[in-house]
């Protein structure tokens, strides 16, 4: 592991942020991403980019961060005790897109690299990331396209990768207190170093590069579908699950808050509007009920 390895990862991530913002701003057609560069007093910094009140995107955030510190936070050493006493660097791109139209799913993507070093010891490093889709009014065509794109990105790295990381995604994006998944899943991987640096880095790039290929065709298909206030209300209600997951379970959110990260960037993923209703239940035989009965049931979408 050399300094040039770390520089290559950082250069890729900065370029990925640029590319994703360009593509999504073009899809929106009205607003652009506004950048907020920031520095972290304890070490590092980042570029937060947010698009709000667009024609298609109600709120979208695409964040790059590169932070470093002299010791690991509790959230990281809890399941990796060998990291205690090491300095660390973490860099990544993380994004969440909340569309206006309830027929367009929310999407989340993240790719990241982590390294912990100590004098006289081999560095501990890994890649992580993935992407997942959260529909409000599900569509089989969209789910198949999303998962087929994910499967194709994984294919060059072995037949085991897609089913393994698809299953991990289903398990990770799960709200235990609701006993339901957050959406229809996608990919989730973490602690990836078994392929060696070059191939592990290549895999992370394949995932990062395929996100817009997975998401943009779905947005284009659904962004002009008509909707009513009741459907908008259901979208806002379901966004509540997004908030619950991010604040209760999400590793990245917890890591960021525990390391004294930049709160505005960490909470950038939260939707601008959301609603909770006491003991709400969908009416039988409605599209809302179908979300629970069909789409929030893990299944094999890829062909």
Curated annotation (Swiss-Prot):
Its cofactor is a divalent metal cation. The record marks 177 as: Important for dimerization. Keywords: Cytoplasm, Heme biosynthesis, Metal-binding, Oxidoreductase, Porphyrin biosynthesis. One of its GO terms (cellular component) is cytoplasm. Pathway: Porphyrin-containing compound metabolism; protoporphyrin-IX biosynthesis; protoporphyrinogen-IX from coproporphyrinogen-III (O2 route): step 1/1. Its main location: cytoplasm. One of its GO terms (molecular function) is coproporphyrinogen oxidase activity. Pfam families: Coprogen_oxidas (PF01218). A divalent metal cation binds at residues 98, 108, 147, 177. Involved in the heme biosynthesis. Catalyzes the aerobic oxidative decarboxylation of propionate groups of rings A and B of coproporphyrinogen-III to yield the vinyl groups in protoporphyrinogen-IX. Belongs to the aerobic coproporphyrinogen-III oxidase family. This is Oxygen-dependent coproporphyrinogen-III oxidase. It comes from Saccharophagus degradans (strain 2-40 / ATCC 43961 / DSM 17024). The gene is hemF.
């Amino acid at each position: 592991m050399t300094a040039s390895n770390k520089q290559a990862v950082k250069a890729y991530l900065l370029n990925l942020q640029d590319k994703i913002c360009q593509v999504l701003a073009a899809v929106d057609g009205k607003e652009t991403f506004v950048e907020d560069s920031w520095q972290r007093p304890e070490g590092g910094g980042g570029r937060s980019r947010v698009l709000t009140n667009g024609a298609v995107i109600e709120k979208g955030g695409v964040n790059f961060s590169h932070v470093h510190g002299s010791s690991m936070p509790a959230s990281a050493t809890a399941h990796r005790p060998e990291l205690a006493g090491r300095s660390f660097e973490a860099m990544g791109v993380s994004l969440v897109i909340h569309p206006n139209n309830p027929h367009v799913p929310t999407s989340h993507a993240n790719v990241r690299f982590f390294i912990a070093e100590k004098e006289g010891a081999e560095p501990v490093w890994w890649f992580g990331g993935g992407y997942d889709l959260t529909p409000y009014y599900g569509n089989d065509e969209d789910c198949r396209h999303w998962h087929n794109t994910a499967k194709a990105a994984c294919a060059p790295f072995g037949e085991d990768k897609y089913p393994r990381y698809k299953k991990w995604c289903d398990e990770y994006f799960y709200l235990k207190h609701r006993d339901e998944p957050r959406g229809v899943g996608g990919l989730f991987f973490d602690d990836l170093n078994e392929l060696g640096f070059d191939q592990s880095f290549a895999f992370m790039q394949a995932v990062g590069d395929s996100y817009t290929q997975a998401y943009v065709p779905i947005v284009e298909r659904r962004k002009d579908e008509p909707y009513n206030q009741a459907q908008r209300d259901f979208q806002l209600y379901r966004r509540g699950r997004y908030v619950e997951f991010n604040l209760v379970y999400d590793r990245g959110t917890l890591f960021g808050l525990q390391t004294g990260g930049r709160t505005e960037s960490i909470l950038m993923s939260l939707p601008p509007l959301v609603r909770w209703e006491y003991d709400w239940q969908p009416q039988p035989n409605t599209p809302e009920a179908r979300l629970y009965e069909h789409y929030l049931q893990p299944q094999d979408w890829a062909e």
